Design a protein with these regions (language model features):
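Conserved coupling/switch loops of ABC nucleotide-binding domains, chiefly the family-specific signature
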Residues: 3, 37, 176
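ABC ATPase "signature
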Residues: 1-11, 18
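C-terminal boundary and immediately downstream tail of ABC-type ATPase nucleotide-binding domains
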Residues: 17-43
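Extended alpha-helical regions
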Residues: 3-4, 27, 49
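Residues located in well-ordered beta-strands
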Residues: 11, 23, 37-39, 101-104
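Generic structural signal for individual residues within well-ordered alpha-helical segments
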Residues: 13-16, 25, 87, 177
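Non-catalytic connector elements of ABC transporters
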Residues: 33, 42-201
């Protein structure tokens, strides 16, 4: 519900896996989805998500399931990464094509997992939807897009990363999300995306 209007009605798992827009994406899940300014680039036969100094090779199955992504190559979009898709590279696998580096600002050991807050070389997405969502869930409104983004990851409980260190994390690119920064809509099927752009309501 946003400003009295239903945003999406579906099973909880569908809302989590395939949110219609930025508002739903950020509302479902805790901690909230990380949202970064970015773009897509072609790399050989594949696609790479680029956000500042971060480069993440996209899983081919993901690209095949979301044909609308092809029309966004080279244009701005918003990249969504859920915290549970980010893990300690020393434990989950050190794949340089899916890696991000950042300074550890905060480490929260929760027993079954470690919540790690990383300052990364990217810009946090700042839109009206993102600001409104932060207010609704009682969080801090995002700062300037010129600031380094803070990304939250759910690390394995055995992770040894410590505050003030530079940590390497690996991203499960099979579960990335993408949004049109102009409409806030999720980028999925070509036909669905076209119809939503013509009629945002």
């Amino acid at each position: 519900m946003r400003k009295g209007e239903l945003q999406q009605v579906d099973a909880p798992q569908v809302l989590y896996d395939r949110p219609d827009n930025l508002f739903v994406a950020g509302f479902i899940g805790s901690p909230a989805m990380n949202l970064l300014e970015g773009k897509l680039e072609r790399d050989g036969n594949g696609l790479v998500a680029v956000a500042g100094g971060l480069r993440l090779a996209l899983d081919r199955e993901l690209v095949g399931a979301r044909p609308a992504l092809a029309s966004f190559v080279g244009t701005p979009l918003i990249i969504g990464i859920r915290p549970e898709s980010i893990d300690d590279a020393a434990i989950a696998g050190d794949d340089p094509r899916r890696q991000l580096r950042g300074e550890v600002l905060l480490r929260e050991s929760l027993g079954s997992e470690v919540m790690v807050h990383l300052s990364v070389d990217a810009r946090q997405a700042v839109t009206d939807e993102v600001r409104e969502l932060a207010q609704d869930i009682g969080g801090e409104a995002p700062g300037s897009a010129d600031q380094r983004a803070i990304v939250v990851g759910r690390f394995n409980a055995r992770s040894r990363v410590q505050t003030a260190q530079t940590a390497r994390a690996v991203v499960d690119t099979r579960s990335l999300h993408f949004f049109d920064p102009q409409t806030g809509l999720g980028i999925y099927d070509a036909e669905a995306t076209d119809s939503k752009e013509l009629d945002p309501s």
